[in-house]
């Protein structure tokens, strides 16, 4: 058997059980996403960097920041590394580490901090995940999860993926194309999950970082059902530009083709902050924490429960708006906002009709750019079915929809946006609508 054929068969063999283990929400389901009957909304960040890679603060400082800000869970996702084993950081060689050490001394007792050497050879020991967990996690109140940013590339193009809930390092696999790089990393993570039984969720990070990944490249990947719809890093181009589709447009393109043509599950859209710069305070500058997150509905605050809820679509993504409930009864989708005083809300219901026009054209007249840009499709894809002013809105399903999703936009400006002019938003995950 050739390597290429083995690669083609591996996803089907390994992923079929996972794709059916936690079914996605669809029109066959009637469901209510609300904090009742022992279920809780849990706010978390799934993309975080510390001094273990290219973040500029210590992991215990980060964990304390998110806990103090009311988060229920945090995933550490340093580049190609886990917070394990003994590691010492040379302070003189790491720019800005003096600020981090000062904060460490302000927030923790002297016996917590381990130093050795003097002058240019002075080093501080980085605390491991287990040490930080023991210090800061609170059962059923605040959870820390070990993760990793699998940092791969194809040529000069970055291909980054976050693994949530992994105790073993997932080395980048490489691949023969952008799609193949993503697929091979998914295959490796799936094989690890099958072997260990640990629920590891892998999501594709910031597709517009370096404008590396198109909707067409990502939509084909088997087993990748999550990507970053909103990433708080100011250099990842969530909104795209005149040639590059924004991530929300990519989302609709991918789900339209995955459902109608590729027979793949829905792609869910995550909100993250991709925190790196914990001492930057100027609005819109640096990759600061707290710009975007997910809110997951689960009964228990444990890694497996969080991953299971995400895989089932029992969550929403946010850059500031909080939801009270999402209700679906098979014939209508209702969204209820946890409204703030003196703030107005607009709720849009968005989707694509079944039988949509799949034709497209290149986004550039330059032949060399044709395959590097998401193609231009008709407005039938990702069209707005209804727009409602107010904190509560309901859309009645007609039966023509392939899927339906909702986005809530607030009149309140994001206090620290990744892109200028952002309003606070919340994104309800898409629901596949079956044939009537």
Where in this protein do the model-derived segments appear?
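Residues at the N-termini of beta-strands
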Residues: 73, 226, 403-405
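Bacterial N-terminal signal peptides
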Residues: 11-21
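Boundary at the C-terminal end of the N-terminal hydrophobic targeting segment
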Residues: 21-27
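Structural recognition of alpha->loop->beta junctions
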Residues: 217-236, 288-289, 293-305
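Bacterial N-terminal signal peptides that target proteins for export
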Residues: 1-11
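A metal-dependent hydrolase metal-coordination microenvironment
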Residues: 31-216, 220, 231-249, 264-267, ...
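C-terminal functional module detector
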Residues: 28-38, 53, 59-63, 258-269, ...
């Amino acid at each position: 058997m050739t390597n290429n054929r083995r690669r083609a068969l591996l996803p089907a063999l390994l992923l079929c059980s996972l794709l059916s283990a936690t079914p996605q929400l669809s029109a066959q389901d009637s469901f209510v996403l609300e904090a009742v009957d022992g279920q809780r909304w849990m706010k978390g960040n799934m993309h975080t960097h510390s001094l273990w890679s290219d973040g500029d603060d210590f992991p215990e400082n980060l964990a304390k920041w998110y806990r103090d800000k009311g988060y229920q869970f945090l995933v550490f996702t340093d580049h190609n590394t886990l917070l394990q084993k003994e590691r010492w950081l040379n302070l003189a060689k790491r720019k800005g580490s003096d600020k981090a050490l000062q904060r460490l001394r302000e927030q923790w007792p002297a016996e917590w901090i381990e130093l050795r050497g003097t002058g240019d050879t002075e080093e501080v020991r980085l605390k491991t995940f287990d040490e930080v967990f023991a210090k800061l996690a609170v059962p059923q109140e605040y959870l820390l999860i070990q993760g990793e940013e699998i940092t791969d590339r194809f040529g000069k193009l970055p291909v980054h993926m976050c693994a949530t809930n992994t105790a073993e390092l997932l080395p980048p696999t490489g691949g023969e194309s952008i799609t193949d790089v993503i697929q091979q990393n998914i295959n490796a993570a799936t094989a690890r999950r099958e072997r260990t039984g640990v629920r590891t969720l892998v999501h594709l990070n910031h597709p517009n970082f370096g404008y590396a990944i198109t909707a067409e490249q990502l939509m084909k990947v088997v087993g990748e059902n999550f990507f970053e719809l909103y990433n708080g890093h100011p250099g990842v181009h969530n909104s795209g530009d005149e040639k590059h589709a924004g991530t929300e447009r990519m989302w609709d393109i991918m789900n339209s083709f995955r459902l109608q043509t590729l027979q793949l599950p829905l792609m869910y859209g995550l909100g993250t902050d991709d925190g790196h710069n914990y001492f930057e305070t100027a609005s819109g500058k640096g990759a600061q924490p707290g710009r975007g997150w997910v809110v997951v509905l689960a009964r228990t605050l444990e890694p497996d429960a969080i991953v299971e809820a995400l895989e089932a679509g029992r969550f929403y993504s946010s850059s500031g708006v909080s939801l009270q409930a999402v209700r679906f009864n098979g014939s209508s989708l209702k969204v209820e906002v946890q409204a703030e005083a003196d703030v107005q809300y607009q709720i849009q219901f968005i989707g694509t009709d079944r039988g949509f026009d799949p034709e497209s054209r290149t986004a550039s007249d330059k032949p060399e750019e044709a395959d590097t840009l998401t193609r231009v499709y008709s407005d039938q894809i990702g069209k707005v079915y209804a727009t409602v002013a107010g904190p509560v809105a309901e859309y009645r399903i007609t039966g023509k929809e392939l899927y339906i999703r909702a986005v809530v936009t607030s009149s309140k400006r994001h206090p620290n946006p990744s892109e200028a002019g952002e309003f606070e938003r919340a994104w309800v995950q898409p629901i596949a609508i079956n044939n009537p």
